[in-house]
Amino acid sequence: MNKLTFFFPGQGSQSVGMMAGFGGSKVIRDTFAEASDILGVDFWKMATETNESINETTNTQPIMLIAGVATWRAWQVVASDVPSILAGHSLGEYTALVVSGGLSFADSLPLVRYRAKVMQNAVPAGVGAMAAILGLDDDTVRAVCAESALNDVLEAVNFNSPGQIVIAGNKAAVERGMELAKIKGAKRALPLPVSVPSHCALMKPAALKLAEYLKDVTITTPQIPVIHNADVASYDNADKIKDALVRQLYSPVRWVETVQAVYTQGITQAAECGPGKVLAGLTKRIVAELPCVAMTSNEALLELQGVLQTN
C-alpha cells in the first residue's frame, strides 16, 4: 500500500478561473466538454467567464465534481501513483466515488444535479441558514445548538477542524445560536452565504427523494476505499454506499475524524484534488504532520509527483 490519499472539496471552493492553473490542458477541457454534453450546460464557460450562475447550487455541485474529476485525470497523465484511500467533503464524496471507480462519471452528473435540486427545494428561501463558529470546542457548540434550538432545528453539521464548526437549521435558531456562541466565548460567529441548510434534519425530505433516485443508479465496489462523511467508514457494498450518501444529507460532515482516520492508516502524503485550498488548510490544522498539496495547477501536480518520487 502506498502512503497517498486524495481529498475532494465540496461547495464553496468554486470560483471563476478556478482551472486557470492548468493552462489549456486537453484532458481538463475534454472532461468539461464531456460533462457539458451530458447535462446540456456549458460548464467551461461558467468556469472561465465572469458570471453568477457558478454559485447556484444546481450548477455548483456538478461543476465541483467536474473540476475534481478533471484534476484527477490530469494527474493520471503525469503520474502513475494511485492513492490508497479517498475522502470528499460533502459533495466531494461523490467525486471520490467517481475516482474510486464505484460510480460512473456519466451517472454522477445528473445525480449531483438532482441532489442539488432536492436540497434547494427542501427548504423555502429564507427559512434556513448556516453559520461558522470559530474558537469553541465540539461539545460547547453542540450545547449551544441544544439550548438555542427551542422548537426549531439547529445542529452542528460540519466539524471542519478543531475550533471551526458549522451550524445549520432554521434561520432564527441559527441567529440565536450565533449570539449564544459569542456569549460562550466564540472568537467569531459568521453567517455563511448559502441558501440551503445542509447536513441537518431539514434535509430529511430531500434525503427521501435522493434515496428513491439512487435506486436506479448503478454503484459498484470501489477500487479504492472511500471514507464516507456520515460514519467515517468505507464500504464495498452498493446498498451500504447508497445508504451512506442518503444519510450524509442530514448528518454532520465529520471531517476532523476523517483526516485523523486516514492518518492512522499510515498515510504520509495528502493532496486536495480539485479547486481551492480549503481542505489543504484544514488538514494542516487537524494533523500538522500530514503534508497536503493543493492540486490547483500543472506545477502543483509536478510538485506532488516530485515529493512522491523522493519519499
Task: State what each model feature region is.
Residues 23-24, 147-149, 182-184, 285-288, ...:
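Short, solvent-exposed amphipathic alpha-helical segments in soluble enzyme
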Residues 256-260:
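Short hydrophobic/charged patches on amphipathic alpha-helices used for structural packing
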Residues 11-13, 100-251:
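Alpha/beta catalytic cores of group-transfer enzymes, especially the acyltransferase/condensing modules
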Residues 231, 291-311:
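Short, flexible loop segments at boundaries between secondary-structure elements
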Residues 1-3, 310-311:
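Short, low-complexity, intrinsically disordered N-terminal peptides in bacterial proteins
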Residues 2-141, 192, 269-299:
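FabD-like malonyl-/acyl-CoA
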Residues 90, 218, 266:
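Conserved functional loop/turn residues at catalytic and ligand-binding sites
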Residues 182, 263-266:
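Non-catalytic positions within long, well-ordered alpha-helices that form the structural scaffold/packing
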